[in-house]
Each structure stands twice: as structure tokens, then as C-alpha cells.
Amino acid sequence: MRRSTHTRRRLLLGGLGLLGLGSLLAWTSLPFGAQPVSTVAVTRADIESSVTALGTLQPRRYVDVGAQASGQIRNLHVEVGDQVHKGQLLVEIDPSTQQAKLDAGRFSIDNLKAQLAEQRAQLKLAQQQLKRQRDLAAVGATREEDLQTAEAQLNVTQARIDMYQAQIRQANASLRSDEAELGYTRIFAPMDGTVVAVDAREGQTLNAQQQTPLILRIAKLSPMTVWAQVSEADIGKIQPGMTAYFTTLAGGKRRWTSTVRQVLPIPPKPLDQTSQGGGSPASATAGATGSQVVQYTVLLDVDNPDGALMAEMTTQVFFVVGQASQVLSAPLAALDDSDNEGLRLAQVFGRDGKVEQRKVRTGLSDRLRVQILDGLSEGDRLVIGAPAASGG
């Protein structure tokens, strides 16, 4: 029994020795310094060259509703999110001051009309007196002075009538202005849309004498406009009408497709330098050294039938510069720069195990792959990270 155990132990030790010897022989048979080669194949793929930018969503159409009349807000009939229709009553301002002014204007007109009626009566009397004086003068029964006085009285009365008529016309014009001011105390929706902001409250006093107080904003949430900020280096590639698409943080993988409507000719600046209007976000950002990155604003519109797009959402925009479908392509990492413009260098791994360097003409490129126009064939294996080969 003990002898059998010693025999098995000798056999086990002998097998381990033979295994170690075989490994040593295999290791010494490999070429010294040989390294594994990583390769990728030239395949067909869809290539899309694009310019990326960040943007902000804004309603294409909106209006800020302000107050043209001063006074206290008596009733505010809408809240943020309410749907409104053109002509709908939104706000009522206390009309006491405007109503009193209108009443005073009407009373003034009544007074002027009464004085006008009096002068017309005086005109009739002056006409009768002048006729009497002329009749008497015809038979020499009155003085010339009395005749002249009657004529002057008639002219004065007619002038007063003209004056009161002019004053009534002036008062009527003021009355129309007062009526308009009274109408301003009732504010109506200028268009259909959604109330997206309310900046006033019931009981708040408005002063419209110096500037127009803003009360609320109404916007149409379809279509929406993306205000995209494109860097100075890329703005030359952007043209009106070119295809673009964008994503939002809330939309996940959903894409919205559109076309460029407009490229604004100057970059927006802070309000203390110039006023851009239109809800344009600032696009010049200062770095730690105080230098500014110049960015230009590009506008594109998109329909929003389901309301998934909301104001102030951040978007990532892709402006499609070029597209190619199922073309020969290779990873950018597999190509090196060349001295010749438009040509790249590729290390092709042959079937014989040798590496051949080729000059490759390329086309469109995205962030990962580049289109192969000439120099490579489908199925070629390209070496990644290998030293430059001879030939080519």
C-alpha cells in the first residue's frame, strides 16, 4: 500500500516537470520582441458630418401684455398655463380716475354747447337789429354810428359761435382720448395662446405714466424656435435651409428635425452694451482670463403638436453638413495624418502577416468614422497603434 503511494507521487512530479519543459521550449520558440497586433476592418456604414451646438427653446410667437392705464388691478382673470383666445378679458383696472375724467369732459362739452346755443340766439338778435338799422338808414332815420355798431355786434356774435364750435370739436377729441383711457382699464388678449408668465397681482397699483408696466405674457407654444449658439469657427458651415435636428434632456432619444431659418449677422451682447430683443440669450461667455468666446445665433423652427417642447429647455443641435449612405469607412483612430492635404495614411495588415502603408483619400467624417474614397477596399484590415510600415 505504501509502495503504491510512492509510485503515484513519482509519476505526478514527472508530469509536472515535462509540462514545465514544454512551456519553456514554446516560449523560446517565439520571436523576441513580438507584439500582438490590433486590427479593424474597412466596412460600409452611414456617415454624417455635422456641427453641434447648444441652444435654448423659445416660443416663435409671443406678446407681452402691458397696461396703458394707471390704477389698481381690480380683477386678474387668468393664471399661468391658462389657454386664452383673442379678445378674451384678462385684467380689469380700477376705472375711477378715468371715469371721472371722462365725465368731466362730457360736462365741459355740455357747457360749451349751452354757450353755443346762447350765442346763436344772440346772432339772431344781432341780425334783426342790423336789419332794423339798415331799414332806418334807408329813410335817414338813424345815425351811421348805430348802423356800424349793429354790424359789429353781428360779426362779434358770429365769431363767438365759431369759437365755441372749435372748442366743442377740441373737447370731443379730448373726450375720445378719455374714452380710450377708460377702455385701457379693461385689457383683452391680443391673440390666441397660453399664458406663460404673470408679473402682477390683484390689488397691485400700476403707474403707466413713465413706462408701460408688464402684466403677463401670452405665447403660442407651436411652433417653437431653437436659439442655437454656434461657435465662430463653425458658423461658416451653417446656411439657411440646411437640415438640422436636436434633442432635449427631457426627450431622451427622441429627435426633432427642422431646417435653419436664419443666421443672425451679429452675436448678441449683454443688455448694457446693446439691446437685441426677441428673447435672445447671451452668447458671449467670458473665460477665467476675461477673454470672450464669440458665438453666433442660429434660428430654427419646429412644430410642437404634443406640447413636449417647453420654453427655456436646453437643446443639443446637430447641423447636418453632409451625409453618405453605406459607403466605405474606417475608424478615425486607424488613420494617421499625411503631408498631403486630403490624404491620410493607413497601415494595412496583409494576409502574409506583413504591414503595408497606404495613402488614403477620405471624404465625410463624423466623430468616430471617416468615409474612404480611394486607397482601401472593403474587408481590408487596418492596424491600430502599430509603428509605421515600409512601402506604400
UniProtKB/Swiss-Prot annotation:
**Primary location group:** periplasm
Q: Which residues form a coiled coil?
A: 109-181
Which Pfam family, any one of them, does this sequence belong to?
Answer: HlyD_D23
* Record note on modification: Predicted to be exported by the Tat system. The position of the signal peptide cleavage has not been experimentally proven.
Null mutant phenotype? Deletion of pvdRT-opmQ leads to reduced amounts of PVD in the medium and decreased growth under iron limitation. Deletion of both PvdRT-OpmQ and MdtABC-OpmB systems strongly affects growth under iron limitation as well as PVD secretion.
Give the UniProt subcellular location, in the record's own words. Answer: Periplasm
Keywords for this entry? Coiled coil, Periplasm, Signal, Transport
Any single Gene Ontology cellular-component annotation: extrinsic component of membrane
Q: Name one GO biological process term.
A: xenobiotic detoxification by transmembrane export across the plasma membrane
State the residue spans of region: Disordered: 267-286
Q: Which InterPro entries is this protein grouped with?
A: CusB_D23, MacA_alpha-hairpin_sf, RND_pump_MFP, TAT_signal
* GO function term, MF aspect, one: efflux transmembrane transporter activity
- Asked if the keyword Repressor belongs to this entry, the reply reads no
Q: Which residues cross the membrane?
A: none
Please, which domain of life does this record's source organism belong to?
Answer: Bacteria
Q: What induces it?
A: Expression is stimulated by iron limitation.
Its signal peptide is 1-36
In the record, the note on similarity to other proteins reads: Belongs to the membrane fusion protein (MFP) (TC 8.A.1) family.
Task of the protein: Part of the tripartite efflux system PvdRT-OpmQ required for the secretion into the extracellular milieu of the siderophore pyoverdine (PVD), which is involved in iron acquisition. This subunit is an adapter protein that stimulates the ATPase activity of PvdT and connects the inner and outer membrane components. The system is responsible for export of newly synthesized PVD after the final steps of biosynthesis have taken place in the periplasm.
Share what the entry says about its subunit structure, partners included: Part of the tripartite efflux system PvdRT-OpmQ, which is composed of an inner membrane component with both ATPase and permease domains, PvdT, a periplasmic membrane fusion protein, PvdR, and an outer membrane component, OpmQ.
What's the protein called, per UniProt? Pyoverdine export membrane fusion protein PvdR
Q: Which organism is it from?
A: Pseudomonas putida (strain ATCC 47054 / DSM 6125 / CFBP 8728 / NCIMB 11950 / KT2440)
Q: Which taxonomic lineage is given here?
A: Bacteria, Pseudomonadati, Pseudomonadota, Gammaproteobacteria, Pseudomonadales
Gene assigned in the entry: pvdR
